[in-house]
Amino acid sequence: MADYSFDIVSKVDTNLIEESISVALKEITNRYDFKDSNSSMELNTKDNEIKLSSADDFKVKSLYDILLTRLSKRGISLKNFQPGKIESALGGTAKQSVKIQQGIPADKAKEIVRIIKDAKIKVNASIQGDQLRVTSKSKDDLQATMALLKGKDLGLDLQFTNYR
């Protein structure tokens, strides 16, 4: 009998983030409360972060709220975004960086494997870099594992791919 498997990943589509940022920037240019505030949002794909800057702390918080609204309207889970502290910058401005979590960190991967083993479902879970591979002889066991993980709040948006 053949083995069946699927992968557990946690990825955010950077194209959707770019589109959300451009829509948010258009909204900012049209809003009266952001007039003459030199507000900006920049996506840094190398560091997986979004940099927000504006005239003061309140406007940076508003920028973050606008960004989250636009991301959620695109269907992007907000679990993978961790905001940093709002810092004062030169010229009386304020800035904030928002980290984008791509992949499953090692500690979360170990936690997921432990949850699967504690459930006593007949599956094997193995960590492969920033994703997990779950294998079993039964498709029903794999579906039970998916349902188990969907029911848990792990602080990450998990996607199930490569179902074979």
Swiss-Prot record:
SUPFAM superfamilies: YajQ-like. InterPro entries: DUF520, UPF0234-like_C, UPF0234_N, YajQ-like_sf. It comes from the Bacteria. This is Nucleotide-binding protein Emin_0136. Nucleotide-binding protein. Belongs to the YajQ family. HAMAP family: YajQ. It holds the Pfam family DUF520. One of its GO terms (molecular function) is nucleotide binding. Keywords: Nucleotide-binding. GO terms for cellular component: cytosol.
